[in-house]
Structure formats: C-alpha cells, structure tokens
Amino acid sequence: MRGARSAPTTDPQELRRRLAAARPRGLEIDGFRRASVLVPLLYGPDGVEVLFTVRAAKLSSHAGEIAFPGGRLDPGETHVEAALRETEEEVGLVVSEDQVLGRLSDHPSPAGYVATPFVAQVPWPQELTLSPAEVDAVFTVPLDELAAIEPRTRVAELQKYRRLLYSYPWGEYLIWGFTGNVVRDLLEAITNGQAQGHDPFDPE
C-alpha cells in the first residue's frame, strides 16, 4: 500500500530544496543517445499547472503521444541548454536557466535516448507558438489534481531490460511511458521530498 502523500509544494525555494533532496539518478545505456526535456510548472492566477504537449501525428516516432517539450542535444550543448532550446522551438516558450528549479532522474525511451528532465518555474499565462512539425496541441493539468491521480502501473520490456511504467489518465489524454515516469518522479520529489523510487530497470 502506498504511503500517504502530502500536498505538493508550490513555493519555488522549497521546490528547489526538495528536487535536490530527491537525489536524481543519472543513467547511461550503451548505444543510447542523450536528450533532455523541460517540465514547465506554470504559475498563474489560478495556481500552478503542468504543461504537456501532444506530439504531431506525422512524426516518425511516438506520434500523437503525450510529452514534455524536449529533444536531443546539439553538439556543444549542455543538457539544460538543450531542454530550453527545444522548448522554445516546439511551443514558443522562452525560459531562462534562472527559472530552472532542478532536475529529475534520467529515463530511457524506446527511440534509443536517455533523457534528463528539468523542472522550471514559468509565469503564466503566455502566448504560445506551436511548431506544426512537432506539436499538434498543448494542454495543462493543475498540479494538485495531477498529484491526486492514482497511477496505473505495468511492467514493460525495453530491449533486454524490464521496467515499471506509470500511466496517469486525464480526460481524453493518457500520460504514460517516459512522460508518465517523469510525472511520477516529479510528484514523489515535490510532495514528500523523497528519493525518486525504483531504478527504471528494477521493477520488483
């Protein structure tokens, strides 16, 4: 039985502390390339929301799936630089490194990437400009409502590895796979300030 989860904090300084205390895990897999994503926490008059994208239906991988903005590193880029660049390119959201509150554990994707997620505080509302080549739509979920969802879990195979996948249903959307696992780590870190759970390849 899962322990009681406290309400997620929205204070930026406390978020920084909890993200650091959660001891994010690095991950290296032979043959996998590096990528990074941004988890935008939108601070607006109605509270804090999390921004998600719906990947373009014409993409060659993960088409139509729910994601965070992000992508592979360009030569010479740091992980955080790549996350911020990709976010601006995909949804037109300009975020500075000063707005980044911390990072979460690395996670692999079936496309052959290991991605590092970064969490950022973003003023809201803002006008977004979506890249039609990459993004069909965006939507937001209030952070407290996201934290209240009881996730579904299943064990899946990634090449020769077994891993536990978390899924969060939200209206017409299902936040799952890589993105669902990042959401799980985010909620574990900012509600209880706990280390980010199982190794992705050790679901027992």
Label every model-predicted segment.
Residues M1-Q126, V135, A156-L158, R162-E204:
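N-terminal leader/linker segments that precede catalytic domains of diphosphate-processing enzymes
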Residues L130-R162:
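Amphipathic alpha-helical blocks and their helix-capping loop/short-beta junctions
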